[in-house]
């Protein structure tokens, strides 16, 4: 039935407050306003960033909210002035938009479009209001996406139109985790052929980093995790050797120094632990080693090292969404997946129905899943 211009009633997973399980409720999704698009979400991954907000440690976290930012679906209707997509198009919502106009979009050095940053951070659409209501209460948006809902409304600049033949239960992962890790290696670090790399944290993002290092032609890729159940799967993504830091009485810096003759060319922290970030930098090769921070640390945490580490030629960098300019890159990444240039299926360890969403969070916290993907319409 055509609901263009009218509100849609559907099911969504609502976070009413921090530290409480999500609750599946009927919500009303308003039609898209000017420059907005309403999307029928078919699949969504569950990411640590969703948990970060749910646990109440995100300073921008506001409740009640519909979480989820790793989704894929079909355009249901478009607001006034929208030209880049039409109803029926296959799309991936983007938490890093690309407006093509702000000074960030015009600068090739960054992918951090700022056009709707302020309102997105406040959980509202660019006009300052929300499109979700539940039981008469306004419900906030999350990261400009809110994919834990059968329908969502996003800004046109936050949408990648992708190949309609793509398997949406796989390419939804390009909305966050896989693009983030893969691009950290290819774009931010610009890993070189024949180099040695080390990756801390072998979840979906760390494994995607390894996949990027392999694509760049790295000679050795060392995977570091205290959960050894991740080691076997790591081999699929190109990791050549594994280190469990708990098995050594010396620092991981020393262990890697001995393994690589002085240090590693490229290191990646995919956990969000500031102590590990320091270890990753200090494991870098003197004179040219580069360390990339990919993990999100808790609010207010600070990094430290001795300036001598940088004076002697190490570089410390950070990355968001893998440095990919989102609307330009995500459609190409989908094509790369379809042309077997990058893996996605191997990241999906669990497929769950929407009503089992809290189970997906439990699996993630226990370290039992790489990525759980939800089938959104029941």
Swiss-Prot record:
Site residues, Important for FDH activity and activation by fatty acids: 117
Annotated InterPro entries: ADH-like_C (IPR013149), ADH-like_N (IPR013154), ADH_3 (IPR014183), ADH_Zn_CS (IPR002328), GroES-like_sf (IPR011032), NAD(P)-bd_dom_sf (IPR036291)
Keywords, comma-separated and alphabetical: Acetylation, Cytoplasm, Metal-binding, NAD, Oxidoreductase, Zinc
Superkingdom of the source species: Eukaryota
GO terms assigned for molecular function: alcohol dehydrogenase (NAD+) activity; S-(hydroxymethyl)glutathione dehydrogenase (NAD+) activity; S-(hydroxymethyl)glutathione dehydrogenase (NADP+) activity; zinc ion binding
Subunit architecture: Homodimer.
Function: Class-III ADH is remarkably ineffective in oxidizing ethanol, but it readily catalyzes the oxidation of long-chain primary alcohols and the oxidation of S-(hydroxymethyl) glutathione.
Protein name: Alcohol dehydrogenase class-3
Species annotation: Octopus vulgaris (Common octopus)
